[in-house]
UniProtKB/Swiss-Prot annotation:
GO terms for biological process: DNA replication; DNA synthesis involved in DNA repair; double-strand break repair; SOS response. It comes from Streptococcus pyogenes serotype M4 (strain MGAS10750). The RecF protein is involved in DNA metabolism; it is required for DNA replication and normal SOS inducibility. RecF binds preferentially to single-stranded, linear DNA. It also seems to bind ATP. The gene is recF. This is DNA replication and repair protein RecF. GO terms for cellular component: cytoplasm.
Amino acid sequence: MWIKELELKHYRNYDHLLASFSSGLNVFIGNNAQGKTNFLEAIYFLSLTRSHRTRADKELIHFDHSTVSLTGKIQRISGTVDLEINLSDKGRVTKINALKQAKLSDYIGTMMVVLFAPEDLQLVKGAPSLRRKFIDIDLGQIKPVYLFELSHYNHVLKQRNSYLKSAQQIDAAFLAVLDEQLASYGARVMEHRIDFINALEKEANTHHQAISNGLESLSLSYQSSVVFDKKTSIYQQFLHQLEKNHQKDFFRKNTSVGPHRDDLAFYINGMNANFASQGQHRSLILSLKMAEVSLMKALTGDNPILLLDDVMSELDNTRQTKLLETVIKENVQTFITTTSLDHLSQLPEGIRIFHVTKGTVQVDSDIH
């Protein structure tokens, strides 16, 4: 899939923008604070209905206005699709082909994106919540049912935690009802995650071995707070541990086990990647990003759109070459932001270059 056209009205520092793109590489050049990252954020938002930079939708609205409109014309294997998101003080409206979507799980996945931004380099050593978010964003695009089950899990989790905080003593019967619901949704969330990580590991290891010239292997491990064994279902084990932890959870006023506590670990040649070098971290994240692209295509039959936000300068020539070889080979539409072409020595011919200045975008008259 690829974005043929994007229109922004009152988004960040863009009062109005209408642009069309190459199905291959699109490079956005400009000084800092001109709107390059805002532009990629808009594509990300149109795909996932959320920003990767802020939780406050009001920050996305141009200072002179009270509403935001984003529309995109997306070419998929199955045909052209029009996406639209409107924001106002009344909330958010999402549309596919002018039809309002009642549920996010009906909208997300229509246009898949993979974002590679400087903050992704913190994925290995950052908080577990970053790694859970990484899993959730990918899985939500690949399997819309995952978002449905995760949303229901979080709703029941909020109810259970609220009860634990307010209760003066344990009502075993009431807690049993919440436990059953939490275990039911939570088990399916964990099953989806485990399957996803197993598939991602194979793709990531292939890319990592290519980047390291066969010197390093990359493995991933889903770290669950629920203790598993092969004889009993995840649901039964999760439910048992929830019941076992009633007193502890009541004392701590929160739920101590479940997918909201889970994590993801990375290993290079069997060693925890927390102890890897900076260069190895860059190779690991690059391998993951390329694996995301490969896996989305393998599981859905269509390519995602790749957003590279000021990260090419973080990669040496070898890593740049591996990345660009992948996107060209797989025919992935790619958006790159940069302050200069000087460090992009590996860019091929046939790219479209845009210049970004104070919320305006001008395309070069020629395709380079």
